[in-house]
């Protein structure tokens, strides 16, 4: 009798035994790793694809766009949404990755992409006829497990087949939202399993009749808002001029949603027409912010030596001295890492 009592399991042990049996069956049915206890394995750092901007890498908290996740980049027209996505493709290719671009807008500029560092010869591009075709192509590419990053430009251009085949005046309320909801339900687990970074570019619209609060909303319904791990809001701050000519824009990117690090951080940088994100401009600005470059009046100095007078002169100096530029970048990266 006493022996039976010793062998009797406590309620907690009974639970664990039942759980172990369930886990064994799940692993047998769906494969090893389909369920695990978080404490059994050390969680690795989040794998990322750099954004092409030092400041934005820091604002995202993990050093770039997380792999195996959905990213949404949205903002007003000509704010730099596609430029950000193209920079991500360039960074992915630099590290040996394979990239695809679903050009639903039929507006991809291969020469601009090449200027930004994209290997256009090895970029896979599709210009689909309708939204269903675009998302089906994206799904098949992701399922191949061969693609590291895929960009869909843009959600607003993912027009449902029914709307394209109908007449101009036909009502198509909610068709695109339903299409996005169905597609994202299907895509999410595949994106995670294949470790693909999926970037959706989206546009802004204004809700009619909103008296209070923000009337702005993104296209394609609410599904993307929920499924996206990272949402970036990009806006123009000021125009950059060379005399009377506008040569680019100063933009601000706000991390509206972030499931892998704290959200609501911001990054500001220059986007120069034809060249993309100004890395040297960022190095100057972040160098001053982290007190690596000292600014006194209009003079900039580094260590014991004066660099130049005026920000543009410093940028020109760093452009001609890549070693100094790399040294400053390394010190900025150290300062960002220490701040975390």
From Swiss-Prot:
Keywords of this entry: ATP-binding, Cytoplasm, DNA damage, DNA recombination, DNA repair, DNA-binding, Nucleotide-binding, SOS response
Any Gene Ontology biological process: SOS response
Compartments it resides in: Cytoplasm
Cystine pairs: none
InterPro entries per the UniProt record, alphabetical: AAA+_ATPase, DNA_recomb/repair_RecA, DNA_recomb/repair_RecA_CS, P-loop_NTPase, RecA-like_C, RecA-like_N, RecA_ATP-bd, RecA_C_sf
UniProt binding sites for ATP: 75-82
UniProt keyword annotation of Transmembrane present: no
Cellular component terms per the entry's GO annotation: cytosol
GO molecular function, a single term: damaged DNA binding
Highest taxon listed in the record's lineage: Bacteria
Function, in words: Can catalyze the hydrolysis of ATP in the presence of single-stranded DNA, the ATP-dependent uptake of single-stranded DNA by duplex DNA, and the ATP-dependent hybridization of homologous single-stranded DNAs. It interacts with LexA causing its activation and leading to its autocatalytic cleavage.
Entry similarity comment: Belongs to the RecA family.
Protein name (Swiss-Prot/TrEMBL): Protein RecA
Organism of provenance: Xylanibacter ruminicola (strain ATCC 19189 / DSM 19721 / CIP 105475 / JCM 8958 / 23) (Prevotella ruminicola)
Highest classification ranks of the organism: Bacteria, Pseudomonadati, Bacteroidota, Bacteroidia, Bacteroidales
Gene from which the chain derives: recA
